[in-house]
């Protein structure tokens, strides 16, 4: 028989050649093979489609983060919390939506830069359920996450403002004695004074929830001047107060929580009789006349004047300062979001 050469390879087929590498088998197409080109084209199309889907998913996520809505939060019994005074808890869909709108308005005017913690705090207020669980720290209005906290702060954390207030101690005490001249227990409360929840507890505000009480400031010019010299005094949002605080003997202020962990409350002792005590986060402390005590009042705290009537009242000057770890852009945004009357 005559020799027959092998048939020539066809160009319209796929030559499948297995190349074993470990446990994998690769299928290669011969150049010019139509099926191989089709498979390569299909693989490229799948890759492009996958990348496009991932890009769309990322864009959707960014949109949701920027415009996300907070799920409604309710009272433990299912009743939405009351909207109104910022001292009350900010749980509740309506209030959280208002905070979101305020944050977005601020970011449009200025920038989203540095707003990550604020965004997270507003978004997760309902998740924290601060008003529904027992805790040693439970701010009643706004909680800023990832903020270092302790019941008491060292003097060095607010050295400049502490020194200003302590140097002003004689003038502040003198002005207190002037406004308290007509103050007598049991008598009608003099002008400018406020009776708090406990009848033995009175306050004289120079700033109340971020608003200056002009008449009271005019009555205490040196104290007002000292406040104006402070670098971290909160004077533009509803978390900021400055006042003379008076407790009569036998008065006990039961455990309460402050509205936010973004502030540090500075207590300057003016008159501290025996038997006066402050307990914050389970840690007791005593005031000293002429010296400042820095407190995070978002922790559970109680105040008591256990002295006798002959000891006279306890008098503390209080000024709310920014927490040292709240950054400048965050402070500006909080002033905008929690502006008085907003």
Which functions belong to the PLM regions below?
Residues 1-16:
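Intrinsically disordered, low-complexity basic segments at termini and long loops, enriched
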Residues 12-13, 17-263, 273-276, 326-342:
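Fe(II)/2-oxoglutarate oxygenase catalytic core
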Residues 246, 270, 305-307:
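Short, low-complexity Ser/Thr-rich regulatory SLiMs
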Residues 247, 271, 281, 296-298, ...:
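Structured beta-strand/turn binding interfaces of compact recognition modules in eukaryotic regulators
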Residues 253-256, 277-279, 295, 301-309:
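Short beta-strand His + acidic residue motifs that chelate non-heme Fe in jelly-roll/DSBH
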Residues 265-269, 294, 309-327:
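A short hydrophobic beta-strand segment most commonly corresponding to one strand
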Residues 270-289:
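A short beta-strand-loop-beta hairpin characteristic of the jelly-roll/cupin
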Residues 286-300:
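Conserved metal-binding segment of the jelly-roll/cupin
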């Amino acid at each position: 028989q005559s020799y027959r050469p092998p048939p020539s390879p066809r160009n319209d087929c796929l030559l499948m050649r297995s190349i074993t590498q470990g446990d994998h088998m690769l299928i290669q197409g011969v150049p010019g093979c139509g099926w191989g080109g089709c498979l390569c084209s299909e693989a490229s199309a799948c890759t492009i489609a996958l990348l496009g889907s991932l890009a769309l998913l990322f864009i959707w996520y960014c949109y949701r983060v920027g415009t996300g809505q907070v799920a409604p939060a309710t009272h433990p019994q299912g009743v939405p919390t009351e909207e109104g005074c910022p001292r009350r808890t900010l749980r509740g869909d309506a209030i959280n939506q208002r905070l979101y709108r305020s944050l977005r308005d601020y970011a449009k005017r200025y920038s989203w830069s540095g707003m990550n913690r604020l965004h997270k705090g507003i978004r997760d207020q309902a998740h924290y359920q601060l008003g529904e669980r027992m805790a040693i720290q439970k701010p009643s209005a706004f909680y800023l996450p990832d903020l270092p906290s302790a019941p008491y702060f060292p003097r060095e954390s607010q050295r400049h403002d502490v020194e200003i207030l302590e140097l002003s101690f004689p003038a502040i005490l003198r002005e207190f004695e002037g406004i308290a001249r007509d103050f007598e227990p049991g008598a009608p409360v003099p002008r400018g004074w406020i009776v708090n929840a406990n009848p033995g507890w009175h306050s004289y505000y120079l700033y109340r929830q971020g608003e200056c009480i002009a008449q009271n400031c005019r009555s205490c010019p040196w104290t007002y001047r000292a406040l104006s010299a402070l670098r971290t005094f909160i004077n533009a949002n509803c978390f900021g107060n400055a006042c003379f605080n008076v407790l009569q003997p036998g008065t006990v202020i039961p455990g309460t929580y402050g509205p936010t962990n973004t502030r540090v409350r500075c207590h300057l002792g003016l008159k501290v009789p025996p038997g006066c005590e402050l307990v914050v986060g389970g840690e007791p402390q005593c005031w000293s006349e002429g010296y400042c005590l820095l407190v995070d009042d978002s922790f559970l705290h109680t105040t008591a004047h256990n002295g006798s009537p002959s000891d006279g009242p306890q008098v503390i000057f209080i000024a709310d300062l920014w927490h040292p770890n709240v950054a400048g852009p965050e402070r500006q945004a909080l002033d905008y979001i929690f502006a008085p009357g907003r």
